[in-house]
Amino acid sequence: MADPPRFAAVDGRADLAEGERAVLDRWKSTDLFRRSLELRRDGRPYVFYEGPPTANGKPGIHHVLTRSFKDLFPRYMSMRGYAVARKGGWDTHGLPVELEVEKSLKISGKRQIEEFGVARFNELCRQSVERYIDEWEAMTERLGFWLDMKDPYRTYDGTYIESVWWSLKRLWDRDLLYQGYKVAPYCPRCQTSLSSHELSQGYQDDVVDPSVFVKFRLTGAEDVSLLAWTTTPWTLPGNVAVAVHPDATYVEVENRGQRLILARERLGILDGEHRITAEMRGGDLVGRTYEPLFTDLLPEGKAFLVLSAPELVSMEEGTGIVHTAAAYGEADLELCLREGVAVRHVVGLDGRFLEGQARYRGIFVKDADPQIIADLEAEGRLYKAGQVHHSYPFCWRCDTPLLYYALTSWFIRTTALKERLIENNRSVDWQPAHVRDGRMGNWLENLVDWNLSRSRYWGTPLPIWICPECDDRRCVGSAAELGLTAQDDLHKPHIDDVVLLCERCGGTMRRVPDVIDCWYDSGAMPYAQHHYPFENQDLFTRRHPADFICEAMDQTRGWFFSLLAESTLLFDKPAYRNVICTGLVLDKDGRKMSKRLGNIIDPAQTFAELGADATRWYFYSAVAPGSDYRVSPELIRDVVRRFVLTLWNTYKFFCEYARLDGYIPEQTAPGGSAGDRPELDRWCLARLAQCIDEVRTALDVYDATAATRTIELFVEDLSKWYVRRSRRRFWKSADVTDSDKRSAYDTLYTALETLARLIAPFMPFLAERLHRNLSGHETGAAAPGTPDSVHLTDYPEAMAGWRDPALVDEMARLRRLVEDGLGGREVAGLGVRQPLREATVHGRPLSPELEAIFADELNVKAVTYVAHGDDEHEGVTLDTVITDDLRLEGLVRNVSRKVNDLRKQADLALDDRIHLHVEADGDLRRAVETHREHLMAEVLATEIGFGRADVLREWSGKIGGEPCWLGVSR
């Protein structure tokens, strides 16, 4: 009794989605992820940081993009023998969580939160961040992203918070954490200031705002006004000064019955004719006073005068005179504090005008703009008004227009280490490379101190206690200093009940009410996930910095920055060595995805229909990181058609014939040196070696796009050149021990087995299916010690005996010559099935084996050569004279093709024999009779009968212009 086949039968349909579900089940049942970690436990560490998502929202297709890259490189490095820990984590604090809970409670704003109760509110926040954990874990698992989600870090854990407190205490001790009164981006809806990196994430383009030119009447001058410009009319009630450039030239003009002063360079903004009546330097205006625009809430102290501020004045826009509202502009506040000018607020923390501002009290500032403009016009203070289209910041979470608002906040003095931050950034390898000195570098060059404090509730409490009696201040660096442990709830409001004894005066110290920026939380994950320095000091040292991180491009001013800043401030080194920044995910027409447009792609549905592997491969191969991705089911299907099916059909071809012939790779020692194999086989192994080398080189520099495209080219060569050129070697009836047939099997097996390992980091499911069948695990015929998963194998390395660059080049030359010859056939109107007598190569001779391939590809009987200069200008000419014998041979080749089409339609097995029935006359019948034996061998016919009969499948038409009927039966 014959042994069962070594290889399981392969379905003609790849059916990625169904196959992936089966692979997932096997991974779970065999605990494969844990086993893979255990296998490499003693390897050299490779450190990957998972940027923590917030699980109070469902994962989207853009998360699939980043998680595809996050999985690729840890898998690759693991197969190279590295120990790759992959700890998951959750970002649990901050405004995004609070806003979600507010919506669920149908409340809005801090007053209603406090009425509801901070303790209850924060408990709901804690529950909210776990709302979609199941969906996130399901997506992560279905994608094939191996991540340890059983023991994740959470930024709300007491151990995590305690590590963050430790870091802030270190900054405090070095005078890098301070309290300051500054103008900062401020959200009136959330009633908290924001950091500059949060600000950068909320800019909206083409925002329409008012553009107004306002007249400030000089005192002591007869109806002369300083002309200033602003796009924020709501700040005009808070005006306390105007600024000029002391060295610029200013002019007094008569224009439309008005006397105005502005910079000479800005005269172009005037409407109508004007006449210059006087000229002066900006310095001559400094110290002059003017009448306030509004008399409500007048400031106490010095105000309403012209200040010298060259750093504030631009001659590119406006009038050269700058309206200054100290409480609503960062540079404005610095100028006024320097000059001793009064600082006053006319707007409350809710973004509405204060009670004392009679005309506008209770009105939200942006809503007050039209009324302010109308009042200015009515009082003769408006020169002209219009609109401006510009970029403006909105709250990155609630989408409210931000205000620049002066208030007391706590800051990290990041500017003190600006140069070190820049140096550390330059040591990082960025993908794309331009991010280092571009987006990230520019951000660091314009660095400001980090606005750390938030006037909110659900976050890491700022660990600073202040004595109200003597203003003594203390920063706490551990829970133990408070008589607590990391297992206690360290959040508001519980932590607010903790009081300390003031060592200076004996008073009672109370904690400042603020929490910290949640981006500081996420940037703390390298050390806080390990509860460093309270434990795991050695573990942290081994896992810092990271070898690799990946997130979307906008994280240059989010997580990438917070990681770099904290690591530099605390450890004087970058937090990571290699970064991949992914671009935006757009629809197929290049539009952003939104519910309104109905173009959102659901990851779960995409995986169910097309498979995770195809989605992953699309993201790796479509564009280089940093570019925007156009995504649609059709584009992902193209990956299946273009690459997956080509590979699958090659794999299926091998398995079908290997099952027929009983091929067993262990008995024929695949791999190793190419030795004395046929030249085509040696070329295949040489191309495989080249592919391996190029893929490893690309992955070593984090270039997934180059790696995938290299693999695609090899698979195309394997299918459309090697397998097509080798088909007859598999078809022939010789036993598998025949040296030529065995070499073909060995070569194709080696290529496919290697490809399974080569694509494993990219397409973990498909690679697993190929590996398990090719290794014999699917049929229970695997050799002892053979890994039962491709993810427990080593990543391919090219064997030295495979490399043959000269042969690779020569085969490429051969294929160029074939293309040239086929072009000649096309010009002559001669199909390739029509044999020709001779082809002449104008260039150096091919080797005998390659010449045979060349002749067969062009279907010529002989090849001759004419000496030529160089390979680049080689060419092929054909003898296009068709003799009677050549014509008959061409006719029978066309018959053979039609019959093999009928075999496929009849769903016959590869080795099924048939009866061939032919109805034809003239030259066509003569061709069949002349080449009868050849035709029978080509179509596996036991006999050929002339005339019609009952058949399984039939075809009728013309061949070579002559009527013909063909039928096949068993």
Where are these regions (language model features)?
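Feature 926 captures the class I aminoacyl-tRNA synthetase adenylation module centered on the KMSKS loop
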Residues: 213, 442-520, 524-526, 532-534, ...
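Phosphate/diphosphate-binding loops
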Residues: 367-392, 817-820
